[in-house]
């Protein structure tokens, strides 16, 4: 059964006098339990339509989730959605699982006449939002969207003039939220310093022997750690959009779309560690009036390999949208084709580790030369790119009916 603007406002506890005076009212309603929430979100759809909604929700789940054995977040949400927007019964176990959500605060908004000429953001990741309007005028440059929040949007008359903002192809969008990007992996550790060269020797008292030995090469820098995975997206949630009187204006149509939450990008791999410093050359020996040369320093160690980029997050499936318009106005609603939520791309590989510094030459013995410094190490290599997340989120359906 259709309700008037003022009847809906009264149910929300909004003052008729204030609304008649042109005041927009926004309030928070405390809902005590899930039955009260279902009652609050009744949109006037007849029993047969509500039954169709429940069947459509469950038709996407195979096998049908059993309340006793299937307690995943997705399964619970599906059964609760079928209860609130359809006529499916809710099992006692699901009631217990959702009990902690109550009492719940619901955002309610009423305005007798509202004109918008810019995007109207109804919120992100809130409990529930209810919008009650008499006449909504959407001028050029306007659009309406909500993210990861259940919505009940009821308006008597819509006047749609002009087009949405640039790069926006919808008038009303029910969206999810992209998962958070993974954080970068930790850098690899610095390679150890190379060992010192052997000391020079005297072959006999007063007679020089061997020069100092060369320092050994520094150790390779550590491999960077793998970037952290991107977060899974947050789903687009169920919405009812009801126009009780009609849609007019130029072009006088409403374009509706939905897309769930894409997976977040994987984190960048950690930078490879710096190569270790080359070991010092061994000192030359002093043998009476002569000595031996110091040994050359060791080469710096190679830089470490960058860490592999993190795995992208999963796109998550969206929930259904129910649009009701007056008889003869089905053509006033344009449904955009479903847009699936992509999986997040893998993170970039970590940068190469820096080349290790050269080791210093050993000092020379009496009247002998010190050893030369070693060479720098080579830089490491770039880490591998992370892999894309494993799941694409299927968009919810948009159902349009006369009522």
Predicted segment positions?
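Glycine-centered low-complexity coil/loop motifs and glycine-rich tracts
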Residues: 140, 144-149, 169-238, 250-322, ...
């Amino acid at each position: 059964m259709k309700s008037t603007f003022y009847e809906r406002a009264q149910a929300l506890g909004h003052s008729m006098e204030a609304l008649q005076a042109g005041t927009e009212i926004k309030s928070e309603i405390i809902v005590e339990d899930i039955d009260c929430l279902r009652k609050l979100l009744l949109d006037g759809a007849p029993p047969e339509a509500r039954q169709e909604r429940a069947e459509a929700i469950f038709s996407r789940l195979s096998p049908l989730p059993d309340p006793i054995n299937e307690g995943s977040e997705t399964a619970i949400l599906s059964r609760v959605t079928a209860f609130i927007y359809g006529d499916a019964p809710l099992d006692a176990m699901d009631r217990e699982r959702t009990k902690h959500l109550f009492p719940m605060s619901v955002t309610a908004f009423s305005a007798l006449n509202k004109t918008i000429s810019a995007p109207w953001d109804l919120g992100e990741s809130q409990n529930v939002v209810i919008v009650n309007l008499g006449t909504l005028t959407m001028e050029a440059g306007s659009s309406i969207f909500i993210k990861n929040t259940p919505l009940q949007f009821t308006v008597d008359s819509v006047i749609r003039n002009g087009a949405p903002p640039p790069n926006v192809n919808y008038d009303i969008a029910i969206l999810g939220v992209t998962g958070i990007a993974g954080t970068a992996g930790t850098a690899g550790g610095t390679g150890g310093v190379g060992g010192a060269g052997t000391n020079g020797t005297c072959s006999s008292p007063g007679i020089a022997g061997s020069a100092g030995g060369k320092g050994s090469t520094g150790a390779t820098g550590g491999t960077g750690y793998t970037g952290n995975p991107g977060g899974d997206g947050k789903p687009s949630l169920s919405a009812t959009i009801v126009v009780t009187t009609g849609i007019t204006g130029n072009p006088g149509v409403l374009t509706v779309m939905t897309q769930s939450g894409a997976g977040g990008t994987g984190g960048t791999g950690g930078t490879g560690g710096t190569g270790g410093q080359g070991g010092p050359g061994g000192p030359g020996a002093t043998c009476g009036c002569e000595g031996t040369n110091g040994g050359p320093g060791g080469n710096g160690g190679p830089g470490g390999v960058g860490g592999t980029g993190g795995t992208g997050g999963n796109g998550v499936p969206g929930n259904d949208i129910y649009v009701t318009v007056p008889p003869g106005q089905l053509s006033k609603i344009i449904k955009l084709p479903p847009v699936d939520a992509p999986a997040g791309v893998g993170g970039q590989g970590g940068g190469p580790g820096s080349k290790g510094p050269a080791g210093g030459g050993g000092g020379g013995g009496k009247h002998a030369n010190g050893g030369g410094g070693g060479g720098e190490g080579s830089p490491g290599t770039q880490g591998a790119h992370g892999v894309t997340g494993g799941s694409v989120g299927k968009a919810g359906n948009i159902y349009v009916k006369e009522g």
